[in-house]
Curated annotation (Swiss-Prot):
HAMAP family: Rhamnon_dehydrat. This is L-rhamnonate dehydratase. Homooctamer; tetramer of dimers. Mg(2+) binds at residues 222, 248, 276. SMART domains: MR_MLE. Pfam families: MR_MLE_C, MR_MLE_N. The record marks 345 as: Transition state stabilizer. Its EC number is 4.2.1.90. Reaction proceeds via a syn dehydration. Its cofactor is Mg(2+). InterPro entries: Enolase-like_C_sf, Enolase-like_N, Enolase_C-like, L-Rhamnon_dehydrat, Mandel_Rmase/mucon_lact_enz_CS, Mandelate_racemase_C, Mandelate_racemase_N_dom, RHMD-like. Substrate binds at residues 29, 55, 345.
Length: 401
């Protein structure tokens, strides 16, 4: 079989600081007013009073959505979305394009390695540049799947289970339980600057949800890098009577020794998890060595599907789970092939968590949502990632080459 070559790569953005606010899409933080995701949630910036109430107040939504499309010389296209916005467009159109155009559609690993090495001098340990590389990588997998007529999960070797079961992340685990999810993960609202009073308030929230959801429904806390080891340890032990399943991302990503100590001090049976803001394969190797229970890479931020597969192998070798952070179809096609991913995350993007809204709405067409907390593998049986780009969105292409 003669495979086509890549003829063009294009990059658009929606939302972010230089466009309309509240656009949603690949930057799921970019929501409108009165949304739970922008309510009083603990962050590393919460210690500053003027940035305590809203995450958008310190600029969590300034990047916006990056959309990368790759076109083969036979006219077929693949695309993907992530969080990088207008700056990601510059990186794609003015730097990464040289490693993409002219390559065979199957040269995904070669392109990936060249992008990583060519950006080492300004990529650091992840962030915007890695988000952009991830988006390109996902677009390449989408194109390859569409060219050969197979869903991405079959390109990875096929499913190891018939369906994916999900827990829901949002402010209302009780509503998630009614929808059939296996668990609910809530954001914490207080941090070390609030002292023991902050711990009492978050524990009261957990206790209230435990009473509403009963003894067996999973409850978890997402701390979003807002704590230190001492505070996180006290919070974990205070939540232990309420059967908290895990405590997540308590510390900034570089604090590996802190994660090691937190795992050592955590209550027996309570898992310690992290990873969504780690941005390189090497950082996940170091994170794995801390002994945490679950690694949680975001496939749109960690280097793409190519890196996610490698991270899963690191975790598997240590007997750890890998449960990616959100990412909808881009995670679905990966985790259904991983033997160490028994469940996955669904991020509730409806403002009040009362309805199921696709995570990347409105930028993806055909994006599936769980039914009774599950997605069957047959739902994924479309070429590539099985979704299409919504070109009715206000796509902006600020750079060309």
């Amino acid at each position: 079989m003669t495979l086509p070559k890549i003829k063009h790569v294009r990059a658009w953005f929606i939302g972010g600081a230089t466009a309309e606010q509240g656009a949603g899409g690949g930057d799921y933080h970019d929501q409108g007013a009165n949304h739970w995701i922008d309510d009083h949630i603990a962050t590393p910036m919460s210690k500053y009073k003027q940035y305590e109430q809203s995450r958008q107040s310190f600029g969590i939504n300034v990047l916006g959505t990056l959309i990368v499309e790759v076109e083969a010389d036979n006219g077929q296209t693949g695309f993907a979305v992530s969080t990088a916005g207008e700056m990601g467009c510059f990186i794609v159109e003015k730097h990464l394009n040289r490693f993409i155009e002219g390559k065979c559609v199957s040269d995904i690993k070669l392109i990936h390695d060249q992008m990583l090495n060519a950006t080492l001098y300004y990529a650091g340990s992840g962030g915007l540049v890695m988000n952009t590389i991830s988006c390109v990588d996902l677009a390449l997998w989408d194109l390859f799947g569409k060219v050969v007529g197979l869903p991405v999960y079959k390109l990875l070797g096929g499913a190891v289970r018939d369906e994916i079961q999900f827990y829901a992340t949002g402010a209302r685990p009780d509503l998630a339980q009614e929808m059939g999810f296996i668990g609910g993960k809530m954001p914490t609202h207080w941090g070390p600057h609030d002292g023991d009073a902050g711990i009492r308030k978050d524990v009261a929230m957990v206790a209230d949800m435990r009473e509403k959801c009963g003894p067996d429904f999973w409850l978890m806390l997402d701390c979003w890098m807002s704590q230190d080891v001492n505070y996180a340890t006290k919070l974990a032990h205070a939540c232990a009577p309420y059967n908290l399943k895990w405590i997540e991302e308590c510390l900034p990503p570089q604090q590996y020794e802190g994660y090691r100590e937190l795992k050592r001090q955590a209550p027996a049976g309570m898992m310690v998890t992290s990873g969504e803001h780690h941005g390189t394969l090497q950082s996940f190797r170091t994170l794995s060595e801390t002994g945490i229970d679950i690694m949680q890479p975001d496939v749109g931020w960690c280097g793409g599907l190519t890196t996610l597969v490698e991270i899963a192998a690191i975790a598997k070798a240590r007997g750890q789970l890998v449960v990616p952070h959100g990412s909808s179809v881009y995670s679905h096609h990966a985790v259904i092939t991983f033997t160490n991913t028994p469940f996955s995350e669904f991020l509730m993007t409806s403002p009040d968590c009362a309805t199921l809204r696709p995570q990347f709405d409105p930028i993806l067409l055909g994006e599936p949502v769980p039914e009774r907390g599950r997605i069957h593998k047959s739902v994924l049986d479309k070429p590539g990632f099985g979704v299409e780009l919504n070109r009715d969105c206000n796509l902006k292409r600020p750079y060309q080459h």
